[in-house]
UniProtKB/Swiss-Prot annotation:
Modified how: Predicted to be exported by the Tat system. The position of the signal peptide cleavage has not been experimentally proven.
HAMAP family for the chain: MsrP (MF_01206)
Gene: msrP
Name assigned to this protein: Protein-methionine-sulfoxide reductase catalytic subunit MsrP
Binding partners and assembly: Heterodimer of a catalytic subunit (MsrP) and a heme-binding subunit (MsrQ).
Enzyme Commission number, as recorded: 1.8.5.-
A GO CC term assigned to this protein in UniProt: periplasmic space
The organism of origin for this protein: Burkholderia pseudomallei (strain K96243)
InterPro entries: MsrP, OxRdtase_Mopterin-bd_dom, OxRdtase_Mopterin-bd_sf, TAT_signal
UniProt key word Oxidoreductase: yes
Protein family membership: Belongs to the MsrP family.
Subcellular location: Periplasm
Record lineage: Bacteria, Pseudomonadati, Pseudomonadota, Betaproteobacteria, Burkholderiales
Amino acid sequence: MLIKKTLRAALAGDDIPRSEITPRAVFEHRRRILQAAGAAAAGGLVGAHGLALAAYASPDAAARKLAAPANPKFVVPEKVTSFKDITTYNNFYEFGTDKSDPARRAGTLRPHPWRVSVEGEVRNPKVYDIDALLKLAPLEERVYRLRCVEGWSMVIPWIGFPLAELIKRVEPTANAKYVQFVTLADPSQMPGLSAPILDWPYSEGLRMDEAMNPLTLLTIGVYGQVLPNQNGAPVRVIVPWKYGFKSAKSIVKIRFVDRQPPTSWNTYAPNEYGFYSNVNPNVDHPRWSQATERRIGEDGFFTPKRKTLMFNGYGDWVASMYRGMDLKKYF
């Protein structure tokens, strides 16, 4: 593939800039959430879903606010990454290969109206518009670690609901063994599609038990507001014990299939990107050690890297799914 040399250069891995902005205090973020929730309660008729729907129709910052209660089961005893870093340091190749490209170029994405087709081995296939999807289950905030295969990480306060809630409603058949996620591929909205980096559209997949795991989050917000375009608006999946590329963005199709689906990076380089791609400090990528990581906005070039945790620190939730598997073979 002609793009390989360029792509490898783009993935050099040590292009992490120092942040000049102090991360927002966690208490300040909580205060905003509580204020938004209080305003919604005072209104009587306006809840989290109403706020979200208004936000997609308006570029106004206040309208983009999204109230959701914090789930105390899902917190991280570490500093939350700043909103600036979360929204300006991204991998979203549909908008370019530089980390700053999504923030600069994703304004062309139109997140509303939006439809997600749920299809395949299910008894109740359905096409959800984003408004209906937002009303499917109660929203909550979860603070998760995000670990990129390139050796950097963040701590991010996502808003969404368990993917399992959607799965239960569509009733998978006994033939459904895997779930595939397909991202929008519209050249008029995504200028990066002109580069033959991957076989578009971008797709990812999970085993059914992984998709049903309580950690797997169908995500529509971050940092107390609806997802910015560069972070995968209007809906993405977050799988916190896997490397970031497994968490598909701007989803338009969710397919239930009977066999392991092709996924974009695994198809591109199966010896480098496994289907499972669980965070594992004992299995290195050919170009990046996975034993340690640099926290964006917090760990400078001269700060010792922090040790990477097995399953990104979520072993109590997920390790049993891989009992007996050779995780070096099934990486």
